[in-house]
């Protein structure tokens, strides 16, 4: 018997069986193959038959000759892989520094240092064939997890990662939104007369890419979510 295709596949595989009736030891002519009974019970007349499967395993075919004798052929199929691989990824400091690593998905991630992608994948069948990532509206790009993408330019970007296995199955896409902002915020001020002889300090700030998170006043109090303060 033969199995087609004979390489890893994520689709069905066809078992092709051919049978012969050997010459008896007593010298008489063999009676010839009458039929082949398929694993699902279907009887096919003649000495050849095909059977399609979608799951790995052992499949039994019963060969019957015209004399009523039978033999069982055990056909092995082990190259079907219909399971999707899995992938996870996160970002780590490019310099290997001791910083908090974000592993959860779903929230925008803020970084003020160069980062490198850390991706890992798993597959229960044919094995991982390739890793791919996409930044923003860009094209899918193949990468080596041993030499992963690095991000050193300031940007706000949506990163998506997926993997393929040898059989052609693709994983669920995993995504992260990152803000890479390495520029410290700047501030400027003006002075204007206030009440009771006091002076107002009018503070304006620029938070570059990610904006200003907070302003700490001289007395230690903190104002959140503003970029100007009097």
Name every feature range the model reports, one short phrase each.
Residues 1-230:
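Low-complexity, disordered linker/stalk regions enriched in Pro/Thr/Ser/Gly
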């Amino acid at each position: 018997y033969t199995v087609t295709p004979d390489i890893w596949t994520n689709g069905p595989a066809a078992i092709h069986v051919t049978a012969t009736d050997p010459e008896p030891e007593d010298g008489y002519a063999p009676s010839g193959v009458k039929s082949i009974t398929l694993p699902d019970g279907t009887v096919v007349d003649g000495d050849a038959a095909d059977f399609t499967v979608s799951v790995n395993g052992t499949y039994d075919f019963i060969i019957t000759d015209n004399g009523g004798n039978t033999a069982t052929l055990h056909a092995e199929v082990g190259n079907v892989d219909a399971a999707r691989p899995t992938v996870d990824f996160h970002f780590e400091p490019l310099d290997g520094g001791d910083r908090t690593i974000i592993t959860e998905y779903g929230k925008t991630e803020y970084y003020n240092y160069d980062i490198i992608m850390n991706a890992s994948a798993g597959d229960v069948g044919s094995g991982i064939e390739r890793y791919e990532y996409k930044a923003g509206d860009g094209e899918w790009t193949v990468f080596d997890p041993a030499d992963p993408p690095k991000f050193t330019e300031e940007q706000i970007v949506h990163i998506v990662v997926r993997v393929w296995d040898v059989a052609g199955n693709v994983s669920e896409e995993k995504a992260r939104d990152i803000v890479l902002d390495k520029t410290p915020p700047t501030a400027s001020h003006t002075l204007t007369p206030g009440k009771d002889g006091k002076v107002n300090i009018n503070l304006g700030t620029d938070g570059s890419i990610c904006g200003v998170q907070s302003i700490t006043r001289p007395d230690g109090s903190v104002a959140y979510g503003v970029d100007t303060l009097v």
